[in-house]
Amino acid sequence: MIMAAGSTGERPFFEIITSIRYWIIHAVTLPAIFIAGFLFVYTGLAYDAFGTPRPDSYFQASESKAPVVTQRYDAKSQLDLRTK
């Protein structure tokens, strides 16, 4: 087989995306990846996997807004009081 100069020997992109084999494979895999990603986030597994707090756990139930630290050098004790 003689290849053109500069050719890598790979199939042209247009030939790949117009093949039936490409669409049979991707008609299953692309929706499956989308559904898996949606379930990963929707079930909360993403929060557990990456260790981030869930949206409902940023504030305590009794609080209606974010806590404000008023003393720069006393911040740790202020936050400790908040969590008790």
Curated annotation (Swiss-Prot):
Q: Which cofactor(s) does the record list? A: heme b
Q: Which GO terms describe its cellular component?
A: photosystem II; plasma membrane-derived thylakoid membrane
- List the subcellular locations: Cellular thylakoid membrane
Q: Which residues cross the membrane?
A: 24-38
Tell me a GO biological process for this protein: photosynthetic electron transport chain
Q: How is the cofactor bound?
A: With its partner (PsbF) binds heme. PSII binds additional chlorophylls, carotenoids and specific lipids.
The record's listing under HAMAP family reads:
PSII_PsbE (MF_00642)
Give the function comment from the record.
This b-type cytochrome is tightly associated with the reaction center of photosystem II (PSII). PSII is a light-driven water:plastoquinone oxidoreductase that uses light energy to abstract electrons from H(2)O, generating O(2) and a proton gradient subsequently used for ATP formation. It consists of a core antenna complex that captures photons, and an electron transfer chain that converts photonic excitation into a charge separation.
Residues recorded as binding heme, renumbered to this chain, are: 26
The molecule here is called Cytochrome b559 subunit alpha
Note the SS bond partners.
Answer: none
Record's InterPro entries? PSII_cyt_b559_asu (IPR006217), PSII_cyt_b559_asu_sf (IPR037025), PSII_cyt_b559_N (IPR013081), PSII_cytb559_asu_lum (IPR013082)
What's a Pfam family this protein contains?
Cytochrom_B559
Subunit structure, as described in the record: Heterodimer of an alpha subunit and a beta subunit. PSII is composed of 1 copy each of membrane proteins PsbA, PsbB, PsbC, PsbD, PsbE, PsbF, PsbH, PsbI, PsbJ, PsbK, PsbL, PsbM, PsbT, PsbX, PsbY, Psb30/Ycf12, peripheral proteins PsbO, CyanoQ (PsbQ), PsbU, PsbV and a large number of cofactors. It forms dimeric complexes.
Query: What UniProt keywords are attached to this protein's entry?
Result: Electron transport, Heme, Iron, Membrane, Metal-binding, Photosynthesis, Photosystem II, Thylakoid, Transmembrane, Transmembrane helix, Transport
What does the sequence similarity comment in the record state about its family?
A: Belongs to the PsbE/PsbF family.
Give the species.
Answer: Prochlorococcus marinus subsp. pastoris (strain CCMP1986 / NIES-2087 / MED4)
Organism domain of life: Bacteria
What kind of membrane protein is this, topologically? Single-pass membrane protein
Q: Name one GO molecular function term.
A: iron ion binding
